Amino acid sequence: MVFIPYAAVTFSYAEYEAKVQNRFNEIGIKVRSIHRAKDPRKMIREAEAICVGGGNTFALAKKMQQQGLMKAILNKIKQGTPYVGWSAGSNVSCPTICTTNDMPIVEPESFKAIGAVKFQINPHYLDANPEGHAGETREQRILEYIEANPRRWVVGLREGCMLHLHDGKMELIGSRPMRIFKKGVETFEVNAGDDLSFLL
């Protein structure tokens, strides 16, 4: 499995690789980090699976764009290669990185991402605002996004939940509901087992 560690900012890519390898050892999967590759796109073309870790989405997108990985990964996904991404890794699977929660600490070439799905993901979705916080809630920020991007669906994916897309069918896995946003549609929630075909 090819691992993309480029969302790491305060620790090294090698440290991230080791951390991820330790977890995947439990299920017998060998991890190869793309930062060691002389030809990153070739590594993607030869990958049996692709895993993109969390961290800072802007740092991740910038490095992926510099190495031409967005299109290479999309091509592999279309061929049936499994893709796993958490946090920033889920953001880059979307058409854009515009619904990340991260600070723009570096400037990528654009906000465009892999586009493996047609909707936007907001990972770590929270309902509550911290006590004493006078800024926008997560929901308010997403409502701003759909105001500017009225054709796009956004899903608020809560902690401990994931989306599994296989053979043209998608399911929510986890014990918490997922919040759904779209311009002109009253915000609603879906649970594990609900039909998500409207997002595809």
Task: Map each language-model feature to its residues.
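Catalytic nucleophile loop
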Residues: 51-54, 77-96
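Catalytic-core regions built around general acid/base machinery
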Residues: 46, 66-80
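Glycine/threonine-rich flexible loop motifs
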Residues: 57-67, 131
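N-terminal beta1-alpha1 cap of cysteine-dependent amidohydrolase-like domains
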Residues: 1-53, 187-193, 200
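General beta-strand structural signal in soluble alpha/beta enzymes
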Residues: 32-34, 52, 84-86, 155-156
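Short, active-site-adjacent cap segments at secondary-structure transitions
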Residues: 10, 57-58, 90-93, 162-164
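C-terminal and late-domain segments of enzyme folds
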Residues: 3, 11-15, 99, 103-200
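Charged helix-capping and loop-helix junction motifs
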Residues: 18-19, 65-71, 105, 136-138
